[in-house]
A protein has these predicted regions:
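Residue(s) in the substrate-gating loop at a strand-loop-helix junction
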Residues: 158
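Active-site helix of classical SDR
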Residues: 138, 174
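C-terminal helical subdomain
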Residues: 2-6, 191, 195, 199-200, ...
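Active-site-adjacent segment of SDR/Rossmann-fold oxidoreductases
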Residues: 163, 184-195
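Conserved glycine-rich cofactor-binding loop
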Residues: 20, 27-29
């Protein structure tokens, strides 16, 4: 049963004070909004993404609005590897000495075409970014997360990762895999109770990926990423302590009040 919390949730200003959170795909869209929201609620944010220019812009915004200490980590998850993830682990430990949360937001859409016509190279690329990279990064960071008293890992899902639909190819399959990864990791960490793991389906949101998937859709009819930040903050912060292995939908939430 999908997880649910009060849509009127209002996070306190210091919700994430003293915490360190990694956000992948932090350069724009939902990742950018989440990184800003986390920093504005006290977290030191590790900004990971493919385009350094975009990450630097988010870094500058965080520095202008908060007293937190963000860092920029340019990384193309199409090339995610065990060695690269180990380097990330050591960089975070060296810079902060801790890690309290990970938002796996980065993802590739891939072609909107049938399985019969889906290019194998595109399939492998989408699966690597959306599934393999999330596994590789999470695996490398588990020692840090396990040292936190209250760590949170949030995987980004999709409606087509819960019910398959034609023409969604590797993207849909990758999100089914992400849901499975979430459930397995949540079950593995439940007994110790130090790391909680959930998935979040942002739904129809005004992002570049949504525009690519639905080019004829009017983006003004969709909520901007900031409208979903109450749920992103809830899952990353201590108010969701003890909630793990759940599937959340942003459509069930309203903006923080």
């Amino acid at each position: 049963m999908p997880g649910k919390a009060d849509g009127a949730y209002t996070p306190r200003a210091d919700l994430l004070a003293g915490r360190v959170v990694l956000v992948t795909g932090a350069g724009d869209g939902i990742g950018r909004a989440a990184a800003l929201a986390y920093a504005e609620h006290g977290a030191d944010v590790v900004l990971l993404g493919r385009t350094e220019r975009k990450l630097e812009a988010v870094f500058d915004l965080i520095e202008s609005r908060t007293e937190t200490r963000p860092v920029v980590v340019p990384a193309d998850l199409e090339h995610a590897s065990e060695d690269a993830a180990t380097i990330l682990y050591h960089a975070i430990r060296r810079e902060y000495g801790r890690l309290d949360g990970v938002l796996h937001n980065a993802g590739l859409l891939g072609p909107r075409t049938s399985i019969a016509e889906y290019p194998v190279s595109d399939w492998l690329e989408v699966m690597h970014v959306n599934v393999n990279a999330a596994f590789i990064v999470t695996r490398a960071l588990m020692p840090l997360l396990g040292e936190s008293d209250d760590a949170s890992v949030v995987f980004t899902s999709s409606g087509v990762g819960r019910r398959g639909r034609a023409q969604w190819g590797a993207y849909a399959v990758s999100k089914f895999a992400v849901e499975g990864l979430m459930e397995v990791l949540a079950d593995e960490t439940a007994r110790a109770g130090r790391v909680r793991v959930n998935s979040l389906n942002p739904g129809a949101t005004r992002t570049a990926m949504r525009a690519a998937a639905y080019p004829d859709e009017d983006p003004r009819a969709l909520p901007p990423p900031v409208d979903h930040m109450g749920l992103y903050l809830y899952l990353m912060g201590p108010d969701s302590r003890g909630i793990t292995g759940q599937r959340f939908d942003a459509a069930a939430w309203s903006s923080p009040r």
